Amino acid sequence: MPVDWFGYVYAATVAAGGIMGYAKAGSIPSLGAGLAFGALLGYGAHLNSQDTPRPLLQLGTSLFLAGLMGARWNRSGKLMPAGMVCMLSVAALVKNLATYNRYLMPAGTKAP
């Protein structure tokens, strides 16, 4: 499989958002969450770049971020940062489901 550039950029964007949250507001939870989710997404992009992609980590992390930030966006009504991360996470979900759908199989089946 080719390198999952979208996944790596998505991971870097989430991590950079956490760093920006810390730099602007001194938010240590934002820094921790941004770096943790960025690391998970980066490792997920690495798994997607293997000969047999394994998209579940990136899909699960994207789904969790979309839900978490979507709820935050709904409460605050502010596009930045919650709305932007929610939309980016939904885009990552759609892209990964479209790209890696044949690698999402029930347990006990073999990869193509």
Curated annotation (Swiss-Prot):
Membrane topology type: Single-pass membrane protein
Keyword Transmembrane assigned: yes
GO molecular function list: transmembrane transporter activity
Record flagged with keyword Transmembrane: yes
Transmembrane feature ranges: 3-23
Keywords: Membrane, Transmembrane, Transmembrane helix
GO biological process: regulation of heme biosynthetic process
Domain of life from the UniProt record: Eukaryota
Subcellular localization(s) per the UniProt record: Membrane
Pfam families hit by this protein: Tmemb_14
Cellular component, GO, one term: mitochondrial inner membrane
Family note: Belongs to the TMEM14 family.
Protein name per the record: Transmembrane protein 14 homolog
